[in-house]
Amino acid sequence: MNTTHGALSALILAGTRPGAPDPMAQACGVSHKAILPVGGTPMVLRVIRALQATPGIGRIAVCIDNPAVLDGLLPSDIEIVPSSPNGPSASVLAGLTQMGTPLLVTTADNALLRPEWISEFLAKCSPQTDVAAAVAPEAVVLRDVPGTRRTFIRLADMAFSGCNLFLFRTPASLQVAALWQRVEKNRKHPLRIAWLLGPGILLRAVCKKLTRAALCKRIGALSGTTAELVPLSDGRAAVDVDKPADLELTEKLIAADAAAKT
């Protein structure tokens, strides 16, 4: 995807999920995981700086339920989008409504995010796609972050971990966010999700015959869009801060990177 300077907006999801408080926030004594310090810097600020350093990105907004927790942290030009109590998918829909497309979406716990990863993702996105998600192939993750424990989705032709980086390129991509919302509502009911995706997809997944192309095609068919998974070349892009071990790993990687630059 080619972007002229300032043509692409970016949204950072930083709200709390409905229900129980985030365990990482509780463990670290903060109200929101987004403000948890990583290497001495609040996570959300690390993400903002990565976006600001990426060519082609203009407007940047943080989507959060209580903006007061960010007082004194954000640069003056960062916008606020109120998050939805109905979960991340509804918050993305709110962001799309306020900011329009194309919209790059990431999360505040994506503390390792780098401008070069964002640029690689955007460059690899097909100009025909409505929505794209960045992924890190398993082999790349294990090469770059040996010993890490990540969740991998296994397809017939690819095993990958998500990178919390999405591009909603066209207005049609709102339909994918709406589909995501339907899946999210049924996240505690696997059979309902399986029914939503269709028995053919489920059968191929169980038999380990579901390919990347077939999965994207099905998502596209359900939402009336074109969708794609975009592999990144750095396995560290799959690391986010979901648990204490992730925080330790993230700070270790940041320290190693800083040492390599001296």
Q: Which sequence ranges carry the predicted segments?
A:
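N-terminal nucleotide-binding beta1-loop-alpha1 segment
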Residues: 1-29
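Short catalytic helix/loop segments, enriched in acidic residues and glycine
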Residues: 27-45
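Short, acidic, metal-binding catalytic loop of nucleotide-sugar glycosyltransferases
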Residues: 50-57
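Short phosphate-binding loop-to-helix
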Residues: 72-105, 112-113, 120
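Conserved core of the sugar-phosphate nucleotidyltransferase
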Residues: 114-221, 232-236
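Short, conserved phosphate/pyrophosphate- and ester-handling motifs at nucleotide-, phospho-/glycolipid
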Residues: 243
